[in-house]
Regions:
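Short Gly/Thr/Asp-enriched flexible loops that form oxyanion-binding sites at enzyme active sites
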Residues: 259-271
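Beta->alpha turn/N-cap motifs
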Residues: 450-451, 467-473, 480
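Phosphate-binding glycine-rich loops and their immediate beta-loop-alpha structural context
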Residues: 141-252, 417-446
């Protein structure tokens, strides 16, 4: 984009370094919560995951009548008093005692149910009891589960599957819930192309909107994805203006760092108030937060979400998710955490809170966390990660074997079945990953850090096995000399996993007639 197309006020090359907590606090203090008109009535059976807008009270009791809790006979309990094996009492069926199935209403003037196995039928219409029964025995009294007028759920309660059953049992067919927030996602960038289009040099697939959309749906919002917008100030401004008219929250993806064509902060300043431009986290530093007023003078929250995938996901979870929860008046669910020992020393930049992705597993009864890839653009690092470790801003890193809290990205029971492999990578490991998962339900977690690092990890009991292909130039032998040198007192089993040939690829027909190389 040419500078002449951009207003003089349109570009500001600055980034703050606001601590994460203060950045979020600054935003939440500026925005309010949804008002009463942001609610809707929907069928109770369709309300899974929705948030109650007002308190919910039962319209009927459940059960709304006295019901038999067992198969048997309904009777007035006092008529059975004194019955015993030596002094049995007899009752006429249909006159004194009445046959009932579980759930049937009790006949008038009865207050107990005799279980069918406790009666002796002595005639076609007569039974005998050899024991007495107390009032209301084997009876579900009216309102045993829910009483008419009883508080079922307070306002702000997120409805689960069993909650829907309780609503219907209480006679509630429709329920007032808080409106699901509609969130605009605006991908920006000249280099972006939609999935399925043939790629040219310089093209980048736009997939962040898919990731962001599904995160929003998980959090109960309704994503509205706009078409890709080119790096043009006026075009982006136009789409943002349209989005704040239609949606409750707006996410502009990319256009948030201090580059030449990053316009989000300037657009927010033009349309409203810029609150934060730059947060002291890695990945995710270029995150932007602000408020923009639409034509109805209603302020809408606008985020600039970094373009790198990992940065985008972290900005979403750390800022967008709590903002959505704040707007509809609920708390952000807590994340499951476990204690783990860090597998190796890890440096970090002072002044930045780092979200370190880790692979996890149990080795010798110790839960280990092995640092994974750290780049902001490496989405595979999130795919492969089992958890996140937060390195504080005032820290220059973490020590090996340091105990720390790990926020889990997978269920703990799956992590406990992980097999940790550290060392040299080989494509055949993909086959092993598939086989272990399919046949045994185990997940092979591979940290490709080189053969020597693998041997060190195995020696330090930081892996289940190591991948290595180290050639001894003196003997021409693979691996053994290194194992003996670096693991002299460690008992190991050496498995020849795969044999392979290495070489180079040439163009079809070998036009340059390459025969060897050195």
């Amino acid at each position: 984009m040419k500078d002449s197309l951009l207003p003089l006020s349109g570009r500001k090359y600055y980034l703050e370094n606001v601590p994460r907590e203060k950045a979020l606090e600054r935003l939440l203090q500026e925005i309010g919560k949804f008002e009463e008109f942001y609610s809707e009535n929907i069928p109770a059976q369709d309300a899974l995951g929705r948030i109650t807008h007002i308190q919910v009270n039962a319209l009927i009791s459940s059960p709304h009548f006295h019901a038999a809790a067992m198969d048997g006979y309904g009777i007035e309990a006092k008529k059975t008093f004194g019955a015993s094996p030596i002094n049995p009492k007899s009752f006429k069926i249909g006159t004194d005692i009445f046959p009932l199935d579980t759930g049937d209403p009790l006949p008038i003037d009865t207050d107990a149910v005799v279980m069918i196995e406790n009666v002796n039928q002595i005639a076609e219409n007569e039974i005998q009891l050899e024991s007495s029964i107390s009032p209301w025995q084997n009876v579900r009294v009216a309102g045993e589960d829910i009483v008419e007028g009883q508080l079922i759920f307070p306002a702000g309660h997120q409805l689960s599957a069993v909650d829907l059953g309780a609503l219907l049992a209480a006679g509630i067919l429709d329920i007032e819930v808080r409106k699901r927030l509609e969130v605009a996602i605006i991908p920006t960038g000249d280099e972006l192309v939609p999935p399925g289009k043939e790629l040219q040099d310089g093209d980048l697939l736009e997939f962040n909107s898919v990731v962001m959309s599904n995160l929003l749906e998980d959090w109960g919002a309704v994503p509205k994805v706009f078409p890709i917008v080119k790096d043009n100030f006026e075009e982006i401004e136009k789409v943002v203006s349209e989005a704040i008219e239609k949606c409750d929250v707006v996410l502009v993806n990319a256009g948030s760092s201090a580059g030449r064509e990053d316009y989000t902060s300037s657009i927010i300043e033009k349309l409203g108030k810029l609150l934060v431009h730059g947060v002291a986290i890695f990945p995710g530093k270029p995150t932007i937060m602000g408020l923009c007023k639409n034509s109805k003078d209603i302020e809408k929250t606008v985020f600039g979400i970094p373009g790198y995938p990992v940065s985008a996901v972290l900005a979403m979870s750390e800022f967008v998710k709590p903002t959505l929860a704040h707007l509809i008046g609920i708390n952000v669910p807590s994340v499951q955490k476990v204690k783990a020992l860090l597998g190796r020393k890890t440096a970090s930049r002072l002044g930045m809170e780092e979200f370190l992705r880790v692979k996890m597993g149990i080795v010798k009864d110790k839960m280990l966390a092995i640092p994974a890839k750290r780049g902001a653009s490496v989405i595979s690092s999130l795919v492969e990660a089992d958890g996140i470790v937060r390195i504080p801003r005032n820290s220059e890193g973490l020590e090996a074997n340091q105990e720390l809290d790990v926020e889990l990205l997978r269920p703990l029971e799956k992590i406990e079945k992980n097999i940790l492999m550290v060392g040299s990578h080989d494509n055949a490991l993909d086959l092993l990953i598939v086989a272990l998962q399919r046949k045994f339900g185990y997940q092979l977690s591979v940290s490709s850090v080189g053969s020597m690092a693998g041997l060190v990890a195995l020696k330090n009991e930081e892996a289940h096995f190591a991948g290595t292909h180290l050639l001894d130039p003196d003997s021409g032998e693979y691996n053994w000399s290194y194992i003996k040198r670096y693991m002299p007192n460690v008992e190991v089993v050496v498995v020849n996993f795969v044999e392979r040939e290495q070489g180079i690829f040439v163009r079809p027909g070998n036009p340059k007639n390459i025969k060897n190389f050195s």
